[in-house]
From Swiss-Prot:
Gene3D superfamilies noted in UniProt: Glycogen Phosphorylase B
Protein name per UniProt: Glycogen synthase
Gene for this chain: glgA
Gene Ontology terms describing biological process: glycogen biosynthetic process
Pathway: Glycan biosynthesis; glycogen biosynthesis
Amino acid sequence: MRVLHVCSELYPILKTGGLADVTAALPPALAGFGVDSRVLVPGFPAFINAIKDKQLLINIPSRFGAEEINIFLAKISNTKIDIYVIDAPSLFARPGNPYADSSNQAYADNYLRFALLGWVAARISEGLDAKWKPEIVHSHDWHAGLVPAYIKASELASGKKAVKTVFTVHNLAYQGLFPMSVFAELDLPGIFLSMNGLEFYGQVSFMKAGLYFADKITTVSPTYAKEIQIYEQGCGLEGLLADRHNDLYGVLNGVDPQIWNPKKDSLIATNYSSTTVATGKAKCKLALQQMMGLAEKEDALLFGIVTRLTEQKGLNLLIEAIGEITSRGGQIVLLGSGDKALEEVFLAAAKKYSKSIAVQIGYDEEQAHRIIAGSDVIMVPSRFEPCGLTQLYGLTYGTLPLVHKVGGLADTVIDSSLENLADGTATGFVFDEFSVESLTLAIRRAFALYNRKTDWKKVRKTAMQQQVTWDSSAEKIYQIYKNLVRENN
């Protein structure tokens, strides 16, 4: 079975969030089920500089504002992934963030940049590469939302049955919204600009295009699949998603054990397994405390936070709960960037409690590994969280997740309640209500369990035994593909 994945990010070449981890890990996981995957990406500088053995497939005349477009088939160093790259310098050859300028303002022509991505995907689905034609095209998030629309448009124009499409929502809150006036530049049928198409409250929505035109929709956890069908989490698309509930699947993301594995992680102070976790984590913790300038206290409960600094991630709650941690002798290490006001608040807290709180603004993949290995608790207090990967990394490294009961966090972390402790299923700490009071109670329960060393070790061992790799999730995705291919035959 041949599957084309269409996305804007791919780890380790280009990553701004968890999307990149998923698009890198899913194709190799699907290979175990006989799926021949290729990936299509925009020609951002990171991709152009990373590819090797490139072959020019076709040169396309000016389109979507791009003066010159070359489509290459290439390899990525140290992987087996075949990748198609759209080299259109006038659209993609820009430094830094792939979506926004140096002032963090979204590029005004993003609609053209990602329309080209969708249009090329449709051409590949029709046989642009004479040697490889996909049976399924699987697009990811709003950047690739127009992929199913262009494929459907081709089907309507030709009268021929098109390949089947799958669209994955990684985060419904980012929708790719543009003024209605841009529709004329997208080269799509006029009938697509309607409520039954791209129109969304007087705007054009790339996300809605994917949700409406794809044959099947997946999102990244069972709970999130339910949440986005109701008003509170539906971002205005809950009606469409509820209408399509029979085509909507919640499939958890997984952890790539080649990258996230304490037994062989070369980025952490020492390797460890579930049998050597006590001594291993103690060494990683000391190394982290030394690196970040914290007091070197083995018995201090260390809370790690690796996140984008946004209101969605629950950082406003955490600010209010800092005193609860420091007053009990706990420590905090935070890695992240985002909202400037939040950055300033956390930097001020680190200055005030320099031996208890350390903050590193920015994103550093290596430091993320060190924080997750060296912390006792990994905090993910998000207001909403489609899946979340950080808590899965925490489970893998024996770093107990403290999470809000929402989305994928609710699906993957089992609270250390008395009942769950008694039956040996507890893996972390879960708070139900998105409030400072509820978060504070969870923090107190973490301290209480930490003081009961035997119970803490049991929960940590259970956490590390959780099956959070891609194996079972890839099988579920494969079954969706298989059913679609059967429908098309």
